[in-house]
Amino acid sequence: YILGVDIGREYLRVAIFNLKNEPIEGILEYSSILEEQDDEATLRYVREKIDETIGRLNVDRAKIKVAGFALPGLIDREGTSYTYLTYEHPGIKGILEEMLQIPVFIDNDSNVMAMAEHTFGVAKDVNNVLCVSVNECIGLGMILNSKLYRGGIGMAGEFGHIRISGLEASCH
């Protein structure tokens, strides 16, 4: 099985897929505490919801071989997050691998969306794809010549939000 986790600022989505990329059941959605708690509390909550999902779906944990995580914000090629869950060593990827005891892939939510659409979705047979994510911030996942484009430092397409002079807005 494959564990998929989408950690948003307002939601936490957890799903388990078979090797044909079919969800065992629908994607389970929980409220998110990403901005309400410190990193340790957030990770405990994520672990609790992963465990709850595994139990609800009656899946043998030993059969889950890999996990994929999507996070908002700036994430580099090595899976280090600079916006949320900003652990320095071993980084959020390493912490999740220690927590779950399986390999973890982690990327920006817009990149994950672009890769999913290019691999399984409406852009399956398209070489160049732009996927725009508009939530609290704006993100862009780019597939160019059938490859995810990351840019020079691995964070291409993540706009976040742009401050406009005279308007008050909190930065995330």
Each PLM stretch: what is its role?
Residues 26, 30-121, 125-128:
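Glycine-rich phosphate-binding loop and adjoining helix at the ATP-binding site
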Residues 12, 80-81, 169:
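Hydrophobic residues embedded in beta-strands of well-ordered beta-sheets
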Residues 17-20, 72-74, 165-167:
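Generic beta-structure capping elements
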Residues 1-25, 131-148:
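Gly/Thr-rich phosphate-binding beta-strand-loop-beta motif of the actin/hexokinase/Hsp70
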Residues 2, 75, 102-106, 143, ...:
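Hydrophobic aliphatic residue packing
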Residues 23, 33-35, 158-160:
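A short local loop/turn or secondary-structure capping micro-motif enriched for an aromatic residue
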Residues 125-172:
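Glycine-rich phosphate-binding loop of actin/hexokinase-like ATP-binding domains
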Residues 9, 108-110, 154:
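Short beta->alpha linker loops
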